[in-house]
Amino acid sequence: MNPTFQDIILTLQRYWGERGCALLQPYDMEVGAGTSHTATFLRALGPEPWKAAYVQPSRRPKDGRYGENPNRLQHYYQFQVVLKPAPADILELYLGSLEALGFDLRKNDVRFVEDDWENPTLGAWGLGWEVWLNGMEVTQFTYFQQVGGIDCKPITGEITYGLERLAMYLQGVESVFDLRWTDGLTYRDVYHQNEVEQSAYNFEHSDVGFLLTAFSAHEKKAQELMVAQLALPAYEQVLKAAHTFNLLDARGAISVTERAAYIGRIRNLARSVAKSYLDSRARLGFPMAPRAWADEVLANIEKQTQKKAAAA
């Protein structure tokens, strides 16, 4: 029998756990993608090695369709794998995970389609590929080049599986709501009402005045927390601001020019938080990094600090 939705998650957790990844839990806030989890966005910064895997519920208010579209949702799941430094055999590891899920690679058409990734609101970009399985995109591969405007060294490899799409292919269904979550329970049973009601909230009932005030409040608090050298709480305020922006965008409450300005404000915050986090790890001496890597980065930071002081 084809694997259930939860079987797929358990198989991926087991596979990556056996390959040295820390199996983490989802970030407990509204985020638009697994990349926004601190285990990816912040851990990609600096010289400290990191291997983690986790499921991340992802919210994109604008994509809601009141539960009427068979493959478009405002809330869905990603399975995220982060490998730093990116291993030379990352593609082979990924293909191994497909085999673990039950794909026969000799009988299925797996294609890597070049697709460099960018997230303007996080000031992040990377070189990468979409993975197409028999004509359907199921995974995004990225080698991070920058996060929060800061160069990534060593390079972090990110693998993002679209769990619903993988499951639809494995189970041979045309609608996400027909997926078997587990025996006797469908995706419709678990999430259809949520899609209907959250779509109504996102498009009709969110309070625009409140959201506009909330965005500015989160922005201000993030800035205050960075002054206090509290990078992680500051980052949470950035995530709150980003989700608030997404709700405003879904509501049609901001114009095209305002939209660009809001994205710029979030990007500036993300850049500041990235630097604040890197500084906080530097103050600790990058304790998880090989000594030579840590010393090199600390020396570069010291050099930049002296250069700024001389220019002042």
Swiss-Prot record:
Q: Which reaction does it catalyse?
A: tRNA(Gly) + glycine + ATP = glycyl-tRNA(Gly) + AMP + diphosphate
Q: Where mainly found?
A: cytoplasm
Record-listed E.C. numbers: 6.1.1.14
UniProt xrefs under Gene3D superfamilies: Bira Bifunctional Protein, Domain 2, Class II aaRS and biotin synthetases, domain 2
Question: Which GO biological-process labels does this protein carry?
Answer: glycyl-tRNA aminoacylation
Q: Example GO molecular function term?
A: ATP binding
Q: Which UniProt keywords apply?
A: Aminoacyl-tRNA synthetase, ATP-binding, Cytoplasm, Ligase, Nucleotide-binding, Protein biosynthesis
Keyword Cell cycle assigned: no
Q: Which CDD domains match?
A: GlyRS_alpha_core
What is one term from the GO cellular component aspect held by the record?
cytosol
Pfam families xref list: tRNA-synt_2e (PF02091)
Q: Which family does it belong to?
A: Belongs to the class-II aminoacyl-tRNA synthetase family.
Q: Which HAMAP family match?
A: Gly_tRNA_synth_alpha
Subunit relationships: Tetramer of two alpha and two beta subunits.
PANTHER family, sorted: GLYCINE--TRNA LIGASE, CHLOROPLASTIC_MITOCHONDRIAL 2 (PTHR30075:SF2), GLYCYL-TRNA SYNTHETASE (PTHR30075)
Q: What is this protein called?
A: Glycine--tRNA ligase alpha subunit
Query: Which gene name belongs to this protein?
Result: glyQ
